[in-house]
Amino acid sequence: MAGSWDTSVLPRVHPTVVHMLADAAARSGGATALVCGDRQLSYAQYLRCVAGFARELAGLGARGARVALICGNSLDIPVATFAVHAAAAQAVPINPTYTARELTHILVDAEAHVVIYDEDVAATVEPLCASLKVPHAIRIGGKTGRSLDAWKQDAALALPEPLPAASDFATLQYTGGTTGLPKGVNITHAQMSVNISQREAALPTRADDERILCMMPLFHVFAVAMCLHLAAYCRGRLVIMPRYKPDVLLDLLVRERITRLPAGPTVFIGLLSHEAFAATDFSSLRTAYSGSAPLPEETLRKWQAATGTPILEGFGQTEAGPVLTYVREGALKAGSVGPVLPLTELQIVDVETGTKVLGAGEIGEIRARGPQIMSGYRNRPKETAEALRDGWLYTGDIGEFDEQGYFTIRDRKKDMAIVGGYNVYPREVDEVLYSHADVKEAAASGVPDSYYGESIRAYVVLKEGARASAEDLIAHCRSNLARYKVPSKIYLVAELPRTTVGKVDRKTLRQKLAAEG
């Protein structure tokens, strides 16, 4: 699909991410590429290690096959990921917290030829690979696994030939699976590479002068896009946190003079209430990026007031390669995910048929097209046909755009509630709750109601020391929402149900709220 678009209007588009890394090593070989704890690699060393491991994978027959990566954050995971690409194999990044049941579905569906894993998951992965008869399993990192920086001094190493083609599959990224079994999204090198350049056009970086902090897990599509690929494209330094700890993040931000901070909304919310936040020096930070879940407007305002740095919010999904829109620097609009990226088209269409195109200010489903859109789902022809219709990706997200072309996401189509015949988008209720001074986190959902069909309920986490009652919060909603949108019940809880990547788990949320009685 990328080939039918005029990509000459974009900053340099590499044929594949392997070419991108090779270019970075050629231009900035002595610059530090990766830092994780006391380990680091220059760009020249990075490429050597990728070449060394890629040659090993190629020798195992990985070309054209799927290679699963079940690893936590470390210096080894970027090397392994690029090595899979360099071996002309398709990378399958998998959440390392998945159970054996969840892993089985993905490994079987992907027909994994090689599984790369670390010692933290060895007890689960090794017997599973044996039972599934996976041809090859390689343990990396830690005290008992292979160290993938072993090739860093071997200047004679070269990438295996031939390199992958732009039309080859680069990744098979499985979607979260909060409803049903995860679906594998096929993304080609062309689709991946053009989206990197689309993001660069919208969010320009400074070549050889960026330091990006990666606290997100590198199996997640947002982390791969906004950390791993962003750093390699601009030849910046990627500082990797093995796991997220707010005090460590704040320390690294100052010590490493971080310039770019991609994170999910829960991180920004948590940092604002951390005891060390007010004393942290944010002078090096140029931009923070938010994605993967809605960012409360109140969080955006508080962050910018406290740090002097904007949080730029974008919109996308795994199927979209993954980014479709982003707020531009200097053009912040609270609550908006910005205008489209170059070479990207978004339309709002009616929810019922998806065929009637709506205008500015009208709410409907977002559909998208562009050179970054997925090829389809693996082994899911029916779901592919439902998602890709008439050249458009139907995102399942509800939103609108204004006269300036700025998009606002209202909710997921499947999360919309119908209360007495009226459409209610839980995210709007969330935003009103977040505007209360005592609220730290909030999540609303529709639940079955014998009279109205559905009614709204919500969980709320209060700030430390806050004293608001559920009745106070309902009164606040009554002052700011139409009557049918006001939660019938609000429950004060210690934490919201979340998925393993930190998003509010909407499926569990609905189930728990419905069970409250």
PLM regions and their residue ranges:
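Gly/Ser/Thr-rich phosphate-binding loop
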Residues: 255-263, 272-333, 345
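ANL superfamily adenylate-forming
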Residues: 120-166, 176, 181, 274
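AMP-binding/adenylate-forming catalytic core of the ANL superfamily
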Residues: 77, 98, 115-117, 370, ...
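Conserved AMP-binding/adenylation subdomain of ANL enzymes
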Residues: 193-211, 221-260, 274
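Conserved ATP/PPi-binding loop(s) of AMP-dependent carboxylate-activating enzymes
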Residues: 339-343, 354-386, 422-424
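Conserved AMP-binding/adenylate-forming core of the ANL superfamily
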Residues: 9-13, 22, 30-61, 65-74, ...
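Conserved pre-ATP/AMP-binding loop-to-beta segment of ANL
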Residues: 14, 30, 156-176, 181, ...
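Conserved AMP-binding A3 loop
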Residues: 42-44, 170-197
